[in-house]
């Protein structure tokens, strides 16, 4: 219990510090999500130890932070409290049920609104004129920013309409539109000044600027969302109708304020806004739900920090907090070892997340990760989930360091540090490593490889485990009889797979090269190799120096290619595959090595009379001519058409010889 008490006190200090940075200095060091998590964690622990520890001065019982010394302090007419946050349906349901169960009214209405991501402001009007503008501060007194607020055009300086009260206290949010935020950072970049990390910081910094003219130039926007005090005796009891009245007096009000009378209605509004927010020109981080009746609000009252009659239902479907339980190591098809965090299962956007890739060991060091840490996981759209940052270090128990493995977790081979900058570790066993072999088979049969329909990763793994496939060439020895022995594969599916295998036997040289999964050799590099060698035999008998002559191949790829073709294990597989496949050249026309332009780099400039640009490029490639898109010193010729552009000017600077269209056509027509 003593350890927990000490941890609580430490957590209180940490939250106070970050609240001071956020509210007072306007210079937060952690994300809003991380701050919210720390507060929730503190609330949980305080509740657990409520009879043994005093929490009167805890940040869970206070609002905001102290004020900046540059601004004068003024008290609010009524306290300007913050809101309690909920992030999941169950917590919102608890709030809803507590309201409904504690009030003996036939029908309770709630006003659902947007939760703006800006700076809360309290405006005081005397006889319809703006008298003072004060920030939230600690909830009871804030900073006088009247001179700056006077520069914000959307804040009414004089109220319009009828029944204007003698004294009026209005609450709202000052924020920066997304479009204005972009313009501001462009302007700051131009003058080589520090950029704002987000629109909220930009709004807060602009509102608190010592020079009111700067505030005016920053184009801030104001929306009203409530009334703190009104001396008008006949003011309506409905918060929703009060907003309408405030609008008639000249206050800008959001178009997304709705009255709801059920949990389901509010939930539908939440889901709608969750999608709609991406189309808004300002940032929001959730919705706010308030009991509509002012009388009921008063009966429900408040805590020292927040009202009991309102809650902020924040968006958190894309970001969740979970705990790292273990670190696993996956071996890829090229032997790269990828650390994977095994986490406490959570749902994000309807998807159950159990594992999260850490990409490389440098990422572990960057995040300072340990087993037992609580982390923020983000998943946007269909993007693979990733860890944003550590939410909380494991403090109550000893956490384990994550060390770099020395041996392959699959085959036991000694691992090699492939890249010190990103700390990439590789297993050099190649296809002798079962995991690499399976992953290569997945790739070999995939759309990027030979595109064998029906042979997915699960079936391939079963075929390997049953001993039916022990190298790449065994795929082409499969038959219906063997396939039907595999679980969940019937005769029709087997026949379809065999048909697809037979279709894949006719393959281009570049496609074949790409399917082999040679490290750093993708479709573009494979095509360059194919255009240079034309045949598999020439490729298998080439030297490292010859690889370096190919466009787009540097020392690393040349080493990978040379090591691959000189490995006896690989040689044997290539030999077997060449006997079972019909590997055709990507160059369909007959190649004449006496062709002036054979294996020469050319670039086109201008338009051509006899062929379209795409057609003339296609013909050139068929003749073994290397076509590039831009001019560089390595280009051998520039082919000049009508109205050539800047490429010709650049080519002349490099003294690149030019060939006009007619002459070029005479050269290639001989071979067509």
UniProtKB/Swiss-Prot annotation:
The gene is ligA. Its cofactor is Mg(2+); Mn(2+). NAD(+) binds at residues 32-36, 82-83, 113, 136, 173, 290, 314. Zn(2+) binds at residues 408, 411, 427, 433. Residues 592-672 form the BRCT domain. The active site is at 115 (n6-amp-lysine intermediate). Its EC number is 6.5.1.2. DNA ligase that catalyzes the formation of phosphodiester linkages between 5'-phosphoryl and 3'-hydroxyl groups in double-stranded DNA using NAD as a coenzyme and as the energy source for the reaction. It is essential for DNA replication and repair of damaged DNA. This is DNA ligase. GO terms for molecular function: DNA ligase (NAD+) activity; metal ion binding. It comes from the Bacteria. Pfam families: BRCT (PF00533), DNA_ligase_aden (PF01653), DNA_ligase_OB (PF03120), HHH_2 (PF12826), HHH_5 (PF14520), Nlig-Ia (PF22745). One of its GO terms (biological process) is DNA replication. Disulfide bonds: none annotated. Belongs to the NAD-dependent DNA ligase family. LigA subfamily. SMART domains: BRCT (SM00292), LIGANc (SM00532). Keywords: DNA damage, DNA repair, DNA replication, Ligase, Magnesium, Manganese, Metal-binding, NAD, Zinc. It catalyses: NAD(+) + (deoxyribonucleotide)n-3'-hydroxyl + 5'-phospho-(deoxyribonucleotide)m = (deoxyribonucleotide)n+m + AMP + beta-nicotinamide D-nucleotide.
């Amino acid at each position: 219990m003593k350890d927990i008490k000490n941890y609580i006190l430490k957590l209180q200090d940490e939250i106070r510090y970050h609240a001071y940075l956020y509210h007072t200095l306007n210079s937060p060091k952690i994300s809003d999500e991380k701050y919210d998590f720390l507060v929730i964690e503190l609330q949980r622990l305080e509740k657990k130890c409520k009879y043994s520890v005093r929490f009167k001065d805890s940040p869970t019982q206070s609002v905001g932070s102290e004020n900046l010394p540059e601004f004068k302090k003024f008290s609010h007419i009524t306290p300007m409290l913050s809101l309690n946050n909920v992030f999941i349906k169950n917590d919102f349901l608890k709030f809803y049920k507590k309201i409904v169960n504690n009030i003996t009214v036939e029908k309770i209405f709630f006003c659902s609104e947007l939760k703006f991501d800006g700076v809360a402001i309290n405006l005081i009007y005397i006889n319809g004129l703006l008298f003072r503008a004060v920030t939230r501060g600690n909830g009871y007194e804030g900073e006088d920013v009247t001179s700056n607020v006077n520069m914000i055009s959307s804040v009414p300086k004089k109220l319009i309409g009828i029944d204007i009260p003698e004294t009026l206290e209005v609450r709202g949010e000052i924020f920066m539109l997304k479009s204005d935020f972009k313009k501001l950072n462009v302007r700051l970049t131009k003058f080589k000044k520090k950029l704002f990390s987000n629109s909220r910081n930009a709004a807060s910094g602009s509102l608190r600027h010592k020079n009111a003219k700067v505030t005016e130039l920053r184009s801030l926007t104001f929306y009203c969302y409530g009334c703190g005090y009104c001396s008008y005796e006949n003011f309506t009891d409905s918060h929703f109708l009060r907003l309408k009245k405030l609008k008639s007096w000249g206050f800008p009000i959001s178009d997304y304020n709705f009255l709801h009378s059920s949990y389901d209605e509010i939930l539908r509004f939440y889901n709608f806004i969750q999608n709609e927010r991406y189309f808004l020109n300002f940032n929001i981080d959730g919705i706010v739900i308030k009991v509509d009746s002012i009388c009921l609000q008063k009966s429900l009252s408040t805590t020292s920090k927040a009202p009991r009659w309102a809650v902020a239902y924040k968006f958190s479907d894309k970001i969740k907090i979970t705990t790292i339980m273990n670190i696993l190591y996956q071996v890829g098809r090229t032997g790269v070892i990828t650390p994977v965090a095994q986490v406490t299962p959570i749902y994000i956007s309807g998807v159950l997340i159990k594992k999260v890739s850490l990409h490389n060991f440098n990422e572990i060091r960057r995040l300072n990760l340990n087993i037992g840490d609580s982390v923020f996981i983000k998943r946007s759209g269909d993007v693979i989930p990733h860890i944003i940052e550590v939410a909380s270090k494991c403090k109550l128990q000893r956490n384990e360091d994550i060390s770099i493995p020395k041996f392959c977790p699959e085959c036991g081979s000694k691992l090699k540090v492939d890249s010190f900058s990103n700390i990439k570790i590789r297993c050099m066993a190649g296809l002798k490593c079962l995991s690499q072999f399976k992953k290569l088979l997945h790739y070999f049969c995939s759309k990027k490889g030979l595109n064998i329909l029906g042979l997915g990763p699960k079936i391939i793994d079963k075929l390997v485990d049953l001993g039916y496939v022990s190298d790449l060439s065994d795929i082409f020895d499969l038959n219906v009889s063997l396939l039907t022995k595999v679980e969940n594969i019937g005769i029709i599916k087997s026949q379809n797979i065999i048909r697809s295998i037979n279709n894949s036997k006719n393959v281009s040289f570049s496609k074949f090269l790409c399917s082999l999964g040679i490290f750093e050799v993708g479709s573009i590099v494979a095509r360059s190799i194919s255009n240079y060698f034309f045949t598999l035999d020439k490729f298998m008998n080439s030297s490292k120096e010859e690889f370096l002559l190919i466009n787009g191949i540097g020392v690393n790829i040349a080493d990978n290619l040379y090591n691959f073709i000189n490995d006896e294990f690989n040689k044997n597989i290539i030999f077997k595959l060449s006997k079972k496949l019909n590997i055709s050249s990507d160059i369909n026309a007959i190649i004449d090595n006496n062709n002036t332009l054979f294996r020469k780099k050319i670039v086109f400039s201008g338009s051509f009379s006899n062929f379209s640009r795409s057609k003339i490029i296609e013909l050139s490639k068929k003749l073994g001519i290397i076509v590039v898109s831009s001019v560089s010193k390595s280009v051998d010729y520039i082919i000049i058409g009508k109205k050539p552009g800047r490429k010709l000017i650049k080519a002349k600077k490099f003294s690149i010889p030019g060939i006009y269209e007619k002459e070029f056509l005479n050269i290639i027509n001989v071979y067509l």
